[in-house]
Amino acid sequence: FFFDVETKDIRKWDQRIKVINYLRKMRKNPKIRVRLLMTTGCIEYWLMLHFKMFAPSILTETDKKRMLAEVVAVEPTYEKGDYASTARIAERYPTAIKNAEKTLRNLISDGLPGLEDTDDRNRWLCTTCKTFSTVNEAISFLEGLER
């Protein structure tokens, strides 16, 4: 699952974990993992991690608009859903992976239960209104399959 974590959705964790547990039961191969790929507020935060390490508050519509403006400042043709501009940004994905990993590590001092992809960690991420992205974990996983 990929979704933006927003303050309005904090109470939806119990619904989400029910769906996740249902999908886990439906797996034919128990080694297949059901992953949550989350980014705080909006996808533009993940895109900005391709350019810099930062973790601003992204709780309001104004915050999301600011994030969109930051992406447009570094990629002027960017619009949501535009393949060409997103592909240009994606070329810098190794930087985004490093920056996203650092944002997660920095959250340990705020109470993040650990870096491992567990239900406890994901519940914490979904309910604390901190800025982060776990998209890097899927990319690292896929890169590991190539080896």
Describe each PLM feature range.
Residues 5-147:
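C-terminal accessory helical subdomains adjacent to catalytic cores in phosphodiester-
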